[in-house]
């Protein structure tokens, strides 16, 4: 297994010809979001393990029957990936596959692990839907992170949300250049943000973080309307991904106008 240089990421684009076209993977390949890619062969990769920093997890893409790759993957995880993750404060290995065949393969190669699995749901934008974001009075104010009239760094709890965003983007400059972000303010505190988590040439994903004390007040909905309106104006597709158990996220996606389009498995096991 070899770690690719960022300038060579494009070489694995063809490995996504089958299965789910994860923006979380494509954004790494296109060097829009921070991550890492490990392959079986630098010159002619057939199978890849893609690390996404924002998701704090991996994706298998390419040939799921690559015997040499499959033979060595557990050894590679035990000796390299375990250290790679622990340096980031992560004590588990999380992975998804791009195809149903990969899901079967994951079950086989990690059969000796205490493998946990759950379903993830993918929502895409219903093109027949119209956005109704008419101005309304709120107890809070909503600003774009690009609004230079407001110093977002001046809010008392900005550092927390800065950590959330930099996990996905590396630094705020990248987000301002390539992404979208709106935040809600109550007094001198930020109480929620909605942002494009991953960006590809034609798609943006949405992420939301709302202060626990301010949930179930419609803040996420109004922030998301601002973000998705901007993204649609750019002519890009929208992508929403959440756990099957996350009913509030599903309800919000549907309220915004998304429709469920795909499902897939995500897997996890602890590392020692």
Task: Describe the function of each predicted region.
Residues 264-268:
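Catalytic phosphate/metal-binding cores of nucleic-acid and nucleotide-processing enzymes, i.e., regions
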Residues 100-114, 221, 244-262:
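Conserved active-site alpha-helix within GNAT-family acetyltransferase domains
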Residues 67-81, 216-229, 251, 255:
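Conserved acetyl-CoA-binding loop-helix of GNAT-fold acetyltransferases
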Residues 1-22, 128-171:
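Short amphipathic alpha-helix that is part of the acyltransferase structural core
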Residues 208, 238-242:
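Conserved hydrophobic beta-strand within the GNAT/NAT acetyltransferase core sheet
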Residues 41, 45, 50-151:
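Acyl-donor-binding surface of acyltransferase catalytic domains
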Residues 169-212:
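A conserved beta-strand-loop-helix scaffold within acyl/acetyltransferase catalytic domains
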Residues 34-51, 179-192:
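Conserved beta-hairpin
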